[in-house]
């Protein structure tokens, strides 16, 4: 039988692309420093939500304003992680604007 390979999949989400790229670079650098193999960061499609509101509360129905929120996503796979890798990732501090989901497989 084949031996099952260990893998950690990290999904990052955020509204600010600069913070997100900085966080992914920080995670990749930490994982490589501890000796694990890293695949990524893979940019996933950006979700764009548009909200349309009336400019005036009373009249001018045709006058509207649009706002948008873009949600940027990244995917990182860490192959063959060691105990040092997991400990280093636990100690890593990320900015508040970045949502992180970690799945071990």
From Swiss-Prot:
NCBIfam families membership: PRK00596.1, rpsJ_bact
HAMAP family per the UniProt record, alphabetical: Ribosomal_uS10
Gene Ontology, cellular component aspect: ribonucleoprotein complex; ribosome
Gene giving rise to this polypeptide: rpsJ
Oligomer and partners: Part of the 30S ribosomal subunit.
Coiled-coil region(s): none
Family in the record: Belongs to the universal ribosomal protein uS10 family.
Protein purpose: Involved in the binding of tRNA to the ribosomes.
Protein name, UniProt field: Small ribosomal subunit protein uS10
Molecular-function GO terms, alphabetical: structural constituent of ribosome; tRNA binding
Native organism: Chlamydia trachomatis serovar L2 (strain ATCC VR-902B / DSM 19102 / 434/Bu)
KW Ribonucleoprotein (keyword) present: yes
Highest taxon, organism lineage: Bacteria
PANTHER family with a match to the protein in the record: 30S RIBOSOMAL PROTEIN S10 FAMILY MEMBER
